[in-house]
Amino acid sequence: MSDSNDDRPFRPFQSQYRWPGVDLLAYKEEGSAPFRSVTRQVLFSGNGLTGELRYFEVGPGGHSTLERHQHAHGVMILKGRGHAMVGRAVSAVAPYDLVTIPGWSWHQFRAPADEALGFLCMVNAERDKPQLPTEADLAMLRADDAVAAFLDGLAG
């Protein structure tokens, strides 16, 4: 059982980006959406908080789901380097970079083949379900050369 709503005032950082009482979870249910090599940890949830703070780690060569939803995210890169897409903007990301994901923006994170990409993600506790892109959405996104290269894993 995850203690992400654990009321202990201190939980020290452990090696490998782990914290005591916090379960290492699958990013999403297999087959629910396309992604590769991603884990999730819910660090803070409940106990009067209206948001959640989660740590995601994208393994080497992996990527999060390309999705959008009504709610916004705030992200801070903690580990490794990679690339992120928000809307039609693609950027290299590195530790301590901040990424703002407005509502209804297509977004995805990708790790390079040789290292993992880890990040904190702050989000509302109550939120809508993500939407996956349709073929028409993908065609619109791929009309931008930088976005097409990113989606093909060629960014950077």
UniProtKB/Swiss-Prot annotation:
GO terms for molecular function: lyase activity; metal ion binding; transferase activity. It holds the Pfam family Cupin_2. Disruption phenotype: Mutant does not release methanethiol and does not show an increase in 1-deoxy-D-xylulose 5-phosphate formation after 5'-methylthioadenosine (MTA) feeding. Mutant accumulates a mixture of 1-methylthioxylulose 5-phosphate (MTXu-5P) and 1-methylthioribulose 5-phosphate (MTRu-5P). Inactivation of the gene increases ethylene production from MTA-grown cells. The active site is at residue 121. Pathway: Amino-acid biosynthesis; L-methionine biosynthesis via salvage pathway; Metabolic intermediate biosynthesis; 1-deoxy-D-xylulose 5-phosphate biosynthesis. It catalyses: S-methyl-1-thio-D-xylulose 5-phosphate + glutathione = S-(methylsulfanyl)glutathione + 1-deoxy-D-xylulose 5-phosphate; S-(methylsulfanyl)glutathione + AH2 = methanethiol + glutathione + A. Its EC number is 2.8.4.6. CDD domains: cupin_TM1459-like. Mn(2+) binds at residues 67, 69, 73, 107. Residues 55-122 form the Cupin type-2 domain. InterPro entries: Cupin_2 (IPR013096), RmlC-like_jellyroll (IPR014710), RmlC_Cupin_sf (IPR011051). Signal peptide: none annotated. Catalyzes the formation of S-(methylsulfanyl)glutathione and 1-deoxy-D-xylulose 5-phosphate (DXP) from 1-methylthioxylulose 5-phosphate (MTXu-5P). The S-(methylsulfanyl)glutathione is reductively cleaved to relase methanethiol in a second reaction. Involved in the MTA-isoprenoid shunt of the methionine salvage pathway. This is 1-methylthio-D-xylulose 5-phosphate methylsulfurylase. It comes from Rhodospirillum rubrum (strain ATCC 11170 / ATH 1.1.1 / DSM 467 / LMG 4362 / NCIMB 8255 / S1). The gene is cupin.
